Amino acid sequence: MNQGKRVGIIGAGNVGATVAYSLAMLGSCHEIILRDNKIDVAKGKALDMSQAAAAVRSHTIVSVAEEMADLTNCDVVVVTAGSPRLPGMSRDDLLMINANITKDVIAGVAKYSPDAIIIMVSNPLDAMTYVALKESGFDRSRVIGMAGILDSARMASFIQEKLGYGGGQIRASVMGGHGDDMVPLARYSTVAGVPLTDLMSTSEINEIVIRTRNGGAEIVGHLKTGSAYYAPAKATALMVEAILKDTKQIHPCAVFLEGEYGHSDVVSGVPVMLGANGAEKIIEISLDESEKIMFEGSCNSVRTLIDTLNKNKFFDKGE
């Protein structure tokens, strides 16, 4: 059904490679093209994945783009490229470094795969999605950030752990930015259709909300030398599949807002309908006053990052 579909993945580290592996095992597309500065590493991973695909009789080919020019005519491009935060590096330093990496990468995507849908995974996620949108010149429906599916999955996992039942039947809902200011919505979270608020006390729900906000940091604390990649990669692969298969399913994703939820010129996580044209529709759900305040705070955190980029003349042309 998906013969001929091409997916480019820029950044073949843990997240990028695991996205590729997940898609290859499912046979979601005809070809996956890895692009990484470490070309030999990318080639080794591509060979390994191609052989794994052969083992499960998947038709998917995994190849390597030695140059951006080899990343042509992709239907979807996943961007995971970026620098981790190193000792002595401020958050603003990291923001500028990754914004410049994103700018370079997106210029190549816009040139060689001008009809692609871009899925951003690089951090800080919401700000990098904003950069990708501005630098590509694409319609906002074709530049989407991966965050909400991951954060919702983390919340669902914590709910199952706390309850001790309901695995596979939990629908957790998270909005807002991918960070400390995300907005987990217990009111819209259910277990087999039963509202979470009927199954847990307010204090238990608050514990889960706090743990969800710190979900990534909790994993880093255990790993010591790395960060999460299985769940982020699976969340990304789900987005790719929804687009390639034109499922029209609703998923929480980071998109550019133009008045939705009362906010504009900012990227934040909201429910969207994913299909062949990307984020085809933004779903506006009703929020109570406290949820609106939390969502506004989340958007303002992203605006602070955008302001930092503007102060550094990042978007000025010709410099």
Swiss-Prot record:
Belongs to the LDH/MDH superfamily. MDH type 3 family. PANTHER family: L-2-HYDROXYCARBOXYLATE DEHYDROGENASE (NAD(P)(+)), L-LACTATE DEHYDROGENASE. NAD(+) binds at G11, A12, G13, N14, V15, G16, D36, N98, V121, S122, N123. GO terms for biological process: lactate metabolic process; tricarboxylic acid cycle. The active site is at H178. InterPro entries: L-lactate/malate_DH (IPR001557), Lactate/malate_DH_C (IPR022383), Lactate/malate_DH_N (IPR001236), Lactate_DH/Glyco_Ohase_4_C (IPR015955), Malate_DH_type3 (IPR011275), NAD(P)-bd_dom_sf (IPR036291). One of its GO terms (molecular function) is L-malate dehydrogenase (NAD+) activity. This is Malate dehydrogenase. It catalyses: (S)-malate + NAD(+) = oxaloacetate + NADH + H(+). The keyword Thylakoid does not apply. Catalyzes the reversible oxidation of malate to oxaloacetate.
